[in-house]
C-alpha cells in the first residue's frame, strides 16, 4: 500500500470512488501480466491492492469479533481481561488510523498516520497471538499456575 501510494488513488471510504469493487478490477482485459509487472503505469493493480487491503481489514474485524466473543469468558477466568481490553482498544485505533490515512490522502500521504497504522498493526497481531496462546493453553491446563496437568 504505502510504496504504491494507493491511498492517493482512492482517498474515500467506505467505497472506492462510489464503488465497493472498482470497475477496473472487474474488467477481465485488465488482468494481464503487464499490469502486474508495470503496476505503477495504470490504475489496475493499485485498485486491486487497495481492494484486497480493505477486504482483509473487514475480514480481520469479523475475526476479531469472533475472538472477542469466544475468548472473553476464558480470559476473564484467567485474569487476562487486560490483554483482551488492549486488543479491542488497539483494533479500534487501527481501524481509525486506516480510515484516517485514506481520508487525509488528498494530494499527499500523511506519513505519520501511515507509520502509526503499520505500528499498531504489529501490536494488534502481537495481542492476537497472545490471546491465541492463552486460549490454546487453557485447553491444555485448567489453571495458569498448575503446569503439571496435561
Predicted feature locations:
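Polytopic transmembrane helical bundles with strong interfacial aromatic enrichment
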Residues: 1-150
Amino acid at each position: 500500500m504505502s510504496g504504491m501510494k494507493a491511498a492517493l488513488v482512492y482517498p474515500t471510504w467506505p467505497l472506492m470512488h462510489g464503488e465497493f469493487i472498482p470497475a477496473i478490477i472487474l474488467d477481465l482485459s485488465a488482468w494481464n501480466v503487464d499490469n502486474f509487472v508495470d503496476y505503477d503505469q495504470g490504475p489496475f493493480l493499485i485498485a486491486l491492492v487497495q481492494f484486497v487491503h480493505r477486504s482483509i481489514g473487514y475480514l480481520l474485524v469479523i475475526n476479531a469479533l469472533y475472538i472477542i466473543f469466544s475468548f472473553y469468558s476464558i480470559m476473564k477466568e484467567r485474569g487476562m481481561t487486560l490483554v483482551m481490553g488492549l486488543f479491542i482498544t488497539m483494533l479500534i485505533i487501527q481501524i481509525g488510523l486506516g480510515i484516517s490515512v485514506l481520508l487525509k490522502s488528498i494530494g499527499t500521504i500523511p506519513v505519520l498516520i501511515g507509520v502509526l497504522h503499520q505500528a499498531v498493526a504489529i501490536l494488534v497481531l502481537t495481542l492476537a497471538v497472545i490471546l491465541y496462546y492463552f486460549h490454546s493453553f487453557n485447553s491444555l491446563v485448567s489453571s495458569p499456575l498448575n503446569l503439571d496437568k496435561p
